[in-house]
Amino acid sequence: RRKKKVNMTIVKEILSWTVEILVTLVIAFTFVYFIGLRTSVVGQSMSETLESGDEILVNRFIYKVSDPKPNDIIVFLPNGNEKSHYYVKRVIAVPGDTVLIQNGAVYVNGELFDEKVDVSAIEEAGLASEELKLEDDEYFVLGDNRNNSEDSRYANIGNVKKDYIIGKAWFRVSPWKKFGFI
């Protein structure tokens, strides 16, 4: 009997393709697991930054290695309610800070908050009409559309605990004309 000669070039090519496919699958899985949460913005509370129906990607990994910072746009479940839709708001104050809304403006630790976007004067200060001190795991959040937002000023949302934060909104995938980093 004759032994069939195996063409080593073909074997190497098959192995190379197999390794490339496996690496691609691992990268894709990692991306989807840590960063790939896609959600829709519901309502006008983040207008002009984000509009109702915008599709965004959420980085679920970043807050496992760092903490939210002022002006980060976060995605969270109100009061940890898993049956609720995701809320998208801007972080105004972080644990240990004090917050006060007075004469339509936001003060953090006695200083006027440095707004990164144009916002209207706040008509309803809610819970922040008196100085609030945030606990070790609490964040004060507001929508960019200050007078049309259900946020930390109201008892049904209140301060957001870190455990309720899903991640950081970082990329808009839809609509195409606004495609890009947030």
Regions found by a protein language model. Name each.
Residues 1-84, 160-182:
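Protein maturation boundaries and topogenic segments
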Residues 45-49, 62-67, 90, 96, ...:
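Short, surface-exposed secondary-structure edge patches
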Residues 54, 69-73, 97, 138, ...:
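Structural motif
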Residues 62-64, 80-82, 99, 106-107, ...:
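Solvent-exposed loop/turn segments at secondary-structure junctions
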Residues 86-111:
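Mid-length scaffold segments of soluble, non-membrane domains
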Residues 108-126:
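PP2C/PPM family metal-dependent serine/threonine protein phosphatase catalytic domain
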Residues 132-182:
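Beta-strand-rich cores of mature extracytoplasmic or soluble domains
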